[in-house]
Amino acid sequence: MALAHQVRSLATTRFPARLLHGWHHPVMGQFMIRDREAFGRISAMMYGINTLGAALGAALAGFYLPLWLGFNATCVLAIVLSLAVALAAFKLSLRPLPKTIQSNASPEPKTEIAEAPPLPTTRQERRAQERLEKSRQEKRPQNEPSSITSDSPPTAGRKAIMALCFLSGFGVLALEVLWTRMFSQVLENSVYTFATILVIVLVCLALGALVSSGLARLKASPLVVLTLLVLAGAGALIATPHVFMYLTDEMQIVTSTGSWSSYILLIFRTAALTIAPSALILGTIFPYLMKTEEAHMKSPGQSLGRLATINTIGAILGALLCGFLLLDGLGIWRSMQIITLLYLVAALCLPLGWNLRSLVTKAVCLVVLLVNMFALDPASLPIISTDPLAREEKVIEIWEASDCTVAVTESQVGTSIKINSHYSLGSTGAYMQEKLQADLPLMIYPETESLFFLGVGTGISAGGALDPSHKNVKKVVACELVPEVITASKKYMTDFHGFDCTGGLFNDPRATVLVEDGRHYLMATNEKFDIVNADLFVPFRSGAGSLYTKEHFESSKKRLTPDGVFVQWLPLYQLTENEFSIIARTMIEVFDQVSMWRHNFQPGDEIVALIGHQKGQTLPASDIDSWADKLYAISGKDPSDLMRLNLPLDPQTILFFYGGNLTAARELFEDYPLNTDDRPVIEYQAPRSYRKGSSDQPPWLVGAPFANLVDKIQTICPPSDDPLLVNRSTDNRRMPLAGSAFHRARIESLKENTEATQKAWTEFVKEWTATD
């Protein structure tokens, strides 16, 4: 349903504009080409220049314009540029046009046709031209060949050329899908990395077109040149996977400790060395096909339109079939091998004749084909890589899907589910930490009956809501975008050495697991939930920024019951203070109150939850008496026991995790921009800002910087005066201060600062044991 909705949306919003854009090249060719022998050269040059413009547009749109202007203003800019082009075209149309195609051939005897037929500029002129040619053919003796078609290849050869035109579009777009998937295994997958690959492909296609424009000047047989180009492109494709493995050290993540610009240059270099040779050579094929069209051309625009139509249909089918069928059925390496095979078969089928040169060319094609199938078979290459820092990690199972590559790995820390080699969705080794993402908000709001989880991953967090300790939970709905992740979770997380880590998520009648885009589901459904719980999302990954936008927070708020809350988990070890502040400012703009809660107290690995509350909400009171448990937990302990403390966790002591009221301290975030769908600053700034740090001073908001931020928030709005805590007792409202002191003690302990550790420990004990 979601896919069908997206297809309808794209068809209605983009089809009309793309249809009109598709007329540009044929119409320009009709205007510019006045010499039959120059058709191939000029058409290829036009195509190359046009594609260079596309590369420049992709670079600007991928790296700068959305951040500078926003998507809406960028679209307006594109419209203005299109109108300027239209105005320029209108002015050119006022100039007089030549009436005939000029020929560079030597004059023929009078009994032959000395001039090329008139250039048809309108439908009426084309029909008149066809009638005139038919009349000439009827008057010409049967043994006298036509001057226009005498050098034309046979009909079978023309069909082979049209098939190659289709394959050129099919192959290049299918390969772009495969190349993107290939590099998603080794890149951080921000919006910039995908833009880099697109720009490289477009630049190579443009350069290939310009090269083919030069080749069109040669007097060599066009079919021989075309065969050699296809053969060279196939050879480059065979080498691509092996070059990729060499440059990425067997698919290890490509990273740089330098600046953002040095990282982008590293990506450009790695991607260019890997895919540029094949993209450049294959990029010459379609433009050079225009050289073979010279013998058949009656109208430049008509010929260009025909070739472009066939090529574009191939491109559409290539992207669709590769993205939805080939990757699922064959995987990345076998799909690339099949596409290479198609190019080699096409080279063999081109009608070169049976002279020695042609036979040698076909023999070389056969040799390359055998090398592709056996000697350099890419199917033996690894599909994903394992973490070199993980001890004895091994791959258990892999799913190559249209969205991503999903793998289950096993190491000494447990069984993990990963996406694209390096993005971990969770592990059995982090069972308690993942389960706490459900437990913490349910301890704050123990009367919760219905929950929505945006993201399933291992299923541990969503399944945690079904724990018997949460007696009031009646409904859990969880959405996961990647179906193979659900498959992996069902297979490996429900029976981990006989234990169901998902808490019965896939068989409990209260739970519903959907393969759906969670954001879109919240926008479309009419269901209401007491808690909407959004999982951790890496902010600098492409697409993740949309889950931190004002519009998403607004649609989530609409899906809450009157007393419901929205919970957004944030991995501070992947956020700078800039990104955290942007997200906080955006949530403050949407929700009446926003509070911050710690997930853990481990310096360097901090996670927080930002909870959006609706108007008039306060935290519910708790009548649990935890006094004895609190005293027992610290009895006889000192700072050396910081890592071994077993503090009680219940709805009364949960305020120990409370970081503060961000709305009351909104002055700290007012200077930061909002993150919106129109201007997704998170998605475009995060990959840049986190590279501003150094190895000595990491940029993340963890450790002391985070503790300092909490101190600022609690100074502006002390827990004793926090409007969210009015239902709590005076001593209970001192628990957030105990949490802050405990976190500070952990930080100083890691620094081996004994005096500061003791001071923070004393403050922790004071606040932890405080009474009215």
At which residue positions do the language-model features occur?
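Alpha-helical transmembrane segments of multi-pass membrane proteins
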Residues: 1-617, 622, 626, 735, ...
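Short, solvent-exposed mixed-charge patches
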Residues: 515, 771-772
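SAM/dcSAM-binding transferase cores
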Residues: 618-750
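Alpha-helical solenoid scaffolds that mediate protein-protein interactions
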Residues: 763-767, 771
